[in-house]
Amino acid sequence: MDKVKIALQYMLPKHLLSRLVGKLAAAEAGTLTTAAIKWFIKQYKIDMSEAAQSEPQAYKSFNDFFTRALKPGIRPINQHTNIMVHPVDGAVSQLGPIKEGRIFQAKGHHYSSLTLLGDQVQDAKRFEGGDFATIYLAPKDYHRIHMPIKGTLSKMTYVPGELFSVNPLTARHVPGLFARNERVVAIFETEHGPLAMVLVGATIVASIETVWAGTITPPTGKQVFTWEYPTVGPDAITLDKGDEMGRFKLGSTVVMLFAKDAIDTFAEGVEAEAVTRMGQAFANLNNPK
């Protein structure tokens, strides 16, 4: 059965399907929208008591519901200076060292950090010998993405690609999954070196948004797009630890890359398959150089 599910993903018109679902999710269809939201809440056992708007009818579209805000203070941010926090609610897929430019995906599968970053050679060099973490956001999860530490945006790259599902089953069977799918790479300068936040698209993920540029995907065409940003002066974009940096419409995966020696140890309990809650301790950082 697993092989059949994977084979179907290769056969499906994933981009067409994603565009169609995106239009439906953006539709403001009144009682139909509310009914769809109620079904989704029941199907995935979503705790709406955490949402800023807990009533399904408060959302005009399914996208509004899916990117819902949480109540203030429901995810307190660990403010310890040398603590990096979880950027999302989800589950750790994998984490560990970046060795010779290779990142572990699942048993028997690695992929290239260079490919993940859109073949940006200088960017990949900055993370050689560092660490990575991959976090999967299930349909039930809160889908806004926050900063794990304070950082100033220096570069953003849009990389076109496939739209395979990014669930654990697909990660085990599709080689180079996260470096094959459509993605947005945001690089920040921090006190602990560069930080890459890679927002990976997936089947029926209608779009990826950032707080500084709005909707990024999908643009017209199949080429890589790169934007560079000033890191000093009035136009610099600096986000504090815990600030929202982006969101998924219909969920996906975040891959984080850290510079060599930035991380001392991952926090207690942070390991593959561990549940994550945005704002809780993710890693202990070394002192800034």
Curated annotation (Swiss-Prot):
Species name: Shewanella putrefaciens (strain CN-32 / ATCC BAA-453)
Its biological purpose: Catalyzes the formation of phosphatidylethanolamine (PtdEtn) from phosphatidylserine (PtdSer).
Membrane topology value: Peripheral membrane protein
GO cellular component terms listed in the entry, alphabetical order: plasma membrane
Positions of the catalytic residues: D89 (charge relay system), H146 (charge relay system), S252 (charge relay system), S252 (schiff-base intermediate with substrate)
Coiled-coil residue spans: none
Post-translational modification: Is synthesized initially as an inactive proenzyme. Formation of the active enzyme involves a self-maturation process in which the active site pyruvoyl group is generated from an internal serine residue via an autocatalytic post-translational modification. Two non-identical subunits are generated from the proenzyme in this reaction, and the pyruvate is formed at the N-terminus of the alpha chain, which is derived from the carboxyl end of the proenzyme.
Top-rank EC class of the record's enzyme: lyase
Protein known as: Phosphatidylserine decarboxylase proenzyme
Catalysed conversion reaction: a 1,2-diacyl-sn-glycero-3-phospho-L-serine + H(+) = a 1,2-diacyl-sn-glycero-3-phosphoethanolamine + CO2
